[in-house]
């Protein structure tokens, strides 16, 4: 033990006390007594609890994961557990091959899809993705069931992405029978690459016949993007009910709204 030693006495009683000169940091204490992935689990838990709070899914119809790129793992909601029963400790730690690293429960059945997106977009392509969400929110699912991209009709949409929200085709019979959830991730990745879409700029997608996935720099930001997707899906549907022949917003308005928030000379908000 390093440190200093104090000596003293009282009458015939002598004592010697050794005091260490180092102390564990708060993070070290948490890792020792609370688990190595405590913070990652907390981030995933808090994001998952936003699904019912933001009305993005009923019952257990959605999941969020939080990614630690340096460690090569992510924390994700356990399969089939109702949101009120979740705790930070119930979040399952999984590696990028889908193997459980820590946790007593089975991870979400959508775990392989999350793993593919992290592996291909965040690791291989270098996209700034720290969280992914999948839900069955009503309006986004409606567009997915129609196998239609969400048109960019207005500035609310353009404030977030400069394109329509892409929708993949259906998975093939072979893909569904082979490895359904993994192939869902592969379909998303191949669809983006075929359209030359940048996952840093287009952070949401619909899977044909299935539903929405969204991602962001953090798990919380992924939830925000999923809420945006649901809202613009609703707005687009209403727009077509009012005017079935409505055309997309002109490019010059799209570019203005997107760049004022995300461009090199962005001026929206407090900086």
Q: Model-found features: residue ranges?
A:
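Extreme N-terminal basic, low-complexity initiation segments
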Residues: 2-5
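Glycine-rich flexible loops
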Residues: 17-19, 25, 29-271
């Amino acid at each position: 033990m390093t440190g200093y030693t104090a000596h003293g006495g009282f009458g015939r009683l002598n004592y010697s006390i050794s005091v260490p000169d180092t102390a564990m940091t708060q993070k070290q204490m948490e890792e020792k007594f609370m688990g190595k992935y405590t913070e990652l689990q907390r981030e995933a838990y808090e994001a998952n609890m936003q699904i019912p709070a933001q009305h993005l899914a009923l019952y257990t119809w959605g999941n969020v994961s939080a990614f630690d790129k340096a460690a090569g793992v992510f924390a994700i909601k356990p399969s089939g557990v109702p949101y009120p029963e979740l705790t930070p400790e119930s979040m399952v730690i999984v590696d990028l091959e889908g193997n459980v690293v820590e946790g007593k429960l089975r991870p979400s059945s959508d775990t392989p899809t999350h793993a593919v997106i992290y592996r291909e977009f965040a690791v291989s392509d270098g996209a700034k993705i720290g969280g992914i969400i999948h839900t069955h929110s009503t309006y986004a699912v409606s567009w997915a069931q129609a196998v239609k991209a969400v048109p960019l009709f207005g500035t609310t949409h353009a404030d977030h992405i400069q394109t329509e929200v892409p929708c993949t085709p259906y998975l093939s019979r072979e893909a569904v029978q082979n490895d359904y959830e993994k192939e869902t991730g592969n379909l998303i990745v191949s669809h983006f690459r075929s359209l030359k879409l940048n996952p840093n700029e287009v952070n949401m997608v619909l899977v044909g016949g299935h539903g929405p996935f969204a991602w962001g720099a953090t798990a919380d930001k992924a939830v925000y993007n999923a809420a945006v997707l649901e809202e613009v899906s609703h707005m687009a549907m209403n727009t077509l009910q009012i005017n079935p022949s409505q055309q997309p917003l002109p490019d010059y308005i799209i570019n203005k709204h997107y760049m004022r928030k995300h461009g090199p000379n962005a001026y929206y908000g407090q900086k």
